[in-house]
Amino acid sequence: MSYKVNSSYPDSIPPTEQPYMASQYKQDLQSNIAMATNSEQQRQQQQQQQQQQQQWINQPTAENSDLKEKMNCKNTLNEYIFDFLTKSSLKNTAAAFAQDAHLDRDKGQNPVDGPKSKENNGNQNTFSKVVDTPQGFLYEWWQIFWDIFNTSSSRGGSEFAQQYYQLVLQEQRQEQIYRSLAVHAARLQHDAERRGEYSNEDIDPMHLAAMMLGNPMAPAVQMRNVNMNPIPIPMVGNPIVNNFSIPPYNNANPTTGTTAVAPTAPPSGDFTNVGPTQNRSQNVTGWPVYNYPMQPTTENPVGNPCNNNTTNNTTNNKSPVNQPKSLKTMHSTDKPNNVPTSKSTRSRSATSKAKGKVKAGLVAKRRRKNNTATVSAGSTNAGSPNITTPGSTTSEPAMVGSRVNKTPRSDIATNFRNQAIIFGEEDIYSNSKSSPSLDGASPSALASKQPTKVRKNTKKASTSAFPVESTNKLGGNSVVTGKKRSPPNTRVSRRKSTPSVILNADATKDENNMLRTFSNTIAPNIHSAPPTKTANSLPFPGINLGSFNKPAVSSPLSSVTESCFDPESGKIAGKNGPKRAVNSKVSASSPLSIATPRSGDAQKQRSSKVPGNVVIKPPHGFSTTNLNITLKNSKIITSQNNTVSQELPNGGNILEAQVGNDSRSSKGNRNTLSTPEEKKPSSNNQGYDFDALKNSSSLLFPNQAYASNNRTPNENSNVADETSASTNSGDNDNTLIQPSSNVGTTLGPQQTSTNENQNVHSQNLKFGNIGMVEDQGPDYDLNLLDTNENDFNFINWEG
């Protein structure tokens, strides 16, 4: 009998094709167990993390009972604010504040001492302790805080607050000193332990300080090892130890067995007779580590401590060890005995300052007082000279070459000539050229760069580049001639503006009292006596610049060239070298460059050289420029160029510019200049207005001096009383009537001079709407022959 296997029954034997079923069940069971264990482990880890977080949160609360109060500091502040509002009789404000701040406190109830808690909407708030004061603790606290804050910040404060603050400072200083002594004692103990010499000694810092001071007091502890080598311990790096020697640990007598501390030399400090039981409220000054009061004075054998705050005149007391140099004080009345001082100090000119380096050494500098030289009108003190602007009543402070404009400068003529040397590109009397680095530099900027050199001997030769003729205080005349040296190649500082100086031949006859200046050939001596009038033997004296009634353009000139007229050949001889551009980074002080004698004998140059011309160039970048020039009795002869005829403003004849051969020479050269036929104006008040000079040519004027209506850009007409000065009929074509020395100002609009001694008035020439030439810079030549040094009153560029 056989049985068939039915696969439908689950408990039947599985076929041979499925042998893996049992093993699969086992794997599934194991995986389920593993997942269960992993989930349990993750749950345990999460629980542990949560417990750690709770412990970290709850641990500070358990350890610090005041942490909750600190965390609720805002609630504490709100309580004090509520208390202040309540005691200030601000009931409504207190109620509104309590409602907004969620304060569970009765509106009319005063705070009491102690915590108080109430329930509100299920929330329990623990209030901090509120101090009960009559006007509110917040108000009283604020009063005390503000008073002490003002005292500590040196803003005042009450007397009690100042006393309290001083007591606090004194306690802090004493604590600082004690801490420094404790650090020193600990260092000594550490060094002794390192050497094996420490035997459990306890060193009191105050006893150690007393031993350092040499006070006869018992040591802090019984010293052991009496046979110890008493050698001081050098400690490098400790400022306290470096300032005084350390006494031995035990200086005992082996025969007697007793310990006796040998007193050391008392240092200089504020701990005189300080013991452990004495009052330590001595006069301490703070900073005990670096300004330690116990510094030795081993040279004082007496044994008395020297206090730094007292005056000790004994010769044995010397300064402490390692005294810094910065602590040495010197009063203003203390003067060194061995330092030579000069009796008079004079600021040098721009050329003499560049002679060489100043010798090293301490030299007392004193300011020389100038009581006689008068620079500006109505001024009797030359300590701060002023330059009066023509046409105005205001005066400007003159920077006349002093270092910081503090030293009186009366040699204005020397300054002016130095200014001409610095601003001039070449010399019209010599072939030497100035330094390229000094082109466009002002003398005041150069003076500020070079230090003032003390004049040791006032009787020595002057370092000025020009002859000095002056009068001393006793009335004697002395002429001192010095040799000029060209300034070195030195970088100078930039200066925005430099006031110009108006120079007249005689400064004593200026009745208008507006311009007080000096001649080019006159320079006061070191005693600053009033200048004396001398005849100018130069055939072509230096052109004088005046102050501008409007600020000068700060841009530099493009270039400047000079030439000389040769009377033998009748030619204008140009100087060596091409035109040299002025440094564009240095602002020019005036739009006119002047060439003056630079080297050689001045007298020989006066007799051998003849006048030349000056090329005026407008500032760079100006397409339309108005050149406003005021001349005084001068003859203007230009080079041979194209001319432009202009109309007279009063409808007169046309003034024609003429070019011809020079009658003084038979050579037909194109550079030869000749004086044309004289054209006299129809009246003394005839004026000429030049309005459109369109090219780089110049006008050849007759050998006369004319005056024109000077129309400024503000359309102001400066009409002067013009006169004509014809030349002499002799062979000298360069002779002109010299103007009076009192010509120093430009007459205002519709105003004539009332000075009877004024022979020649200001000659006004206006060049308007000067055009630029394509591919060229503007080049306007004004050949000034036989001009007086007072010819130019002012020059104003406007664009």
Curated annotation (Swiss-Prot):
It comes from Saccharomyces cerevisiae (strain YJM789). GO terms for biological process: regulation of biosynthetic process. It is found in: Nucleus. Its main location: nucleus. Signal peptide: none annotated. SMART domains: LisH. Required for diploid filamentous growth, haploid invasive growth and flocculation. Putative transcriptional activator of FLO1. Residues 354-370, 482-497 have a biased composition (Basic residues). This is Transcriptional activator FLO8. Residues 41-55, 307-317, 341-353 have a biased composition (Low complexity). Keywords: Activator, Nucleus, Transcription, Transcription regulation. InterPro entries: LisH (IPR006594). GO terms for cellular component: nucleus.
